[in-house]
Amino acid sequence: MYETNELALNFALKSHPGRIRPLNEDAVGADPGIGLFILADGLGGYNAGEVASTMTVSMLLTDLGAQLARANGGVDTFDPTDALRNALVAMNSAIFRAALNSAAYEGMATTVVIAWFLGGRLWVAHAGDSRLYRLRDGQLEQITRDHSFSQELVDAGMVSAEEARVLPAKNLVTKALGATPDLEPEVHDYDVQPGDVVLMCSDGLTEMVSHLEIGGLITGCGYDVVESARRLIDLANEAGGRDNTSVILVRVAAPESQSDSTVEQAQADPDLAAQEEIPVLQLRDPVVH
């Protein structure tokens, strides 16, 4: 458990390559000391997707932490919206330039979703179809809106949300880091209540597991973030595991509550019989997997 800016956070991070793909192009990371959590999904079909996602998580943790440090931790005067926008614009340019300068990285890009618990509020930034949900009072709500072709069709009333799930172009994103030279970041902030659970995930989860199943599993686990993270990954793999699957779960707890926090990165394992357990983290420093 970490306490940051009046919030006590219990969290778990887990990533798995799935049953089909030998390479995990997802990346997850956190700086729990400042309440910062980041998930990225290197876009399938592009070169060096794993480079783009890992680069994104690592550099954003460093950049955002440095921006907050320069403000001397002055949460009251620090503007997280500007910090997130500036960091994402710089990250987009860095990936785009790297792709231009190396044939090995040509066309690489990544989605990203960021949750930053700061000053008693939650700031959310994203690009692409990696999502952030909030579970409050037993109700799971999708907070982010996918930047995708299928979502645009849903918004236009041309297809239903269920029909969009089976479209041939369902994985075509309309915004991603490194895909174009310019990026208009999407950043919003939300209130936070004790007991809230925030779920961040790559599309490897949402393509395999329904909205109702996700909410039911977390509540069925008694809002235990570590157990929920493990079981969500297992559920995606049991449903076929066609893509890499990553989840970050953060529960806002009372300051005096006690809970472990963990990061797990499983290796490719079709029968799910063996998963590598990563020890409980008790560090303030950023962690990337």
Segments and roles (model prediction):
Residues 1-289:
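PP2C/PPM-type serine/threonine phosphatase catalytic domain
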